[in-house]
Regions:
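Mid-length scaffold segments of soluble, non-membrane domains
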Residues: 48-62
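Extended, aromatic/histidine-rich regions of cofactor-dependent oxidoreductases associated
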Residues: 19-23, 65-296
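Short, small-residue-biased leader/transition segments that mark boundaries at the very start
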Residues: 1-18
Length: 296
């Protein structure tokens, strides 16, 4: 099933294709997992498992096309130099991937630099795959081998329940059979307020500047709105352009508190397809994926 490349013995240097620089979002599929009730299994991320650095590398499609991809290719899988997180040398480390259509996007790259410097070891040095807009687990780190498949890749963590959610909505706490799960692809619309920080005291007579970022998986942001009255009313913000497709977009505005008291600033983003963040944690699932509730 590894017969997607016409000449599997081909060896190429990355200098044979053009270097690219792209600012690309990487978000853990379980970003916001800690907010699910009952608790979902996995690292209890709050809302900070997202970044959007500038990567330097080459387009994955340029490498694949240079090697020659067979017509029956449907999936690209990766293998890294890491070992299983348990430390067991006999256990296979994560080996995920993306459909050939995602691999061939202009923004899918093999990167060796991040923010103008060699990628740090914990971020995948010396090479990592970056397939932005999908769960970060598809962007393999410590990359040492790619396989082009004529079937869906079957590496470690490709099968349910890993990086999968129920095909239909289920009641919180339900047991969901693996055959009733579907793999996560594009991540949902989401936002994060980066200023002000929580817990500050503010003179209510002064305007409070508000800044943050918004992103929408494979799609674009059409607007970001703020509320200081628990979602009763919403104020528009100024949303900047994306540095390139699949980069997050920054927003800024200000709020004026009407009187002294306790306030929360909520942010709610909308994408170009009209989908917006829910005000409560959506779609409970056993592994706690895809929480895109309003940031507050």
């Amino acid at each position: 099933a590894h017969h997607g490349i016409r000449d599997s013995s081909t060896s190429r240097g990355l200098g044979d294709v053009y270097e690219r620089q792209l600012q690309l979002q990487l978000e853990c599929g379980g970003n916001g997992r800690s907010e699910f009730v009952p608790a979902a299994s996995g690292n209890q991320w709050t809302t900070g498992a997202i970044g959007c650095p500038k990567f330097t590398g080459v387009r994955l499609r340029d490498v694949l096309n240079y090697c020659g991809v067979a017509r029956d290719a449907v999936y690209v899988g990766y293998y890294g130099a890491d070992t299983h997180t348990s430390g067991n040398p006999d256990a296979d480390p994560i080996s995920r991937g993306v459909p050939i259509s995602k691999a061939m996007e202009r923004e899918s790259i093999i990167a060796w630099a991040m923010n103008g410097e060699d990628i740090p070891l914990q971020n995948g040095f010396p090479l990592r795959l970056v397939c932005s807009g999908w769960p970060g687990s598809v962007s393999g780190k410590w990359l040492n081998r790619l396989v082009v498949r004529n079937q869906v890749h079957d590496g470690e963590k490709m099968a349910a329940p890993s990086y999968s959610v129920p095909q239909t909505h289920v009641a919180p706490g339900s047991r969901v059979p693996n055959e009733d799960m579907k793999v996560i692809e594009s991540m949902p619309v989401k936002s994060i307020v980066t200023f002000p920080r929580s817990g500050i005291n503010q003179d209510y007579r002064q305007r409070m500047p508000v800044r943050g970022h918004a992103w929408a998986g494979d799609d674009q942001i059409s607007g970001v709105f703020l509320s200081i009255d628990f979602g009763a009313t919403w104020l528009p913000t100024a949303v900047g352009s994306a540095a390139n497709r699949l980069s997050w977009q920054s927003f800024e505005s200000w709020v004026q508190f009407p009187e002294p008291g306790y306030y929360e600033i909520w942010a709610r983003a909308m994408d170009n397809l009209g989908r917006s963040q829910p005000m409560v944690v959506p779609g409970w699932n056993p592994r706690g994926y895809l929480n895109n509730a309003c940031h507050r």
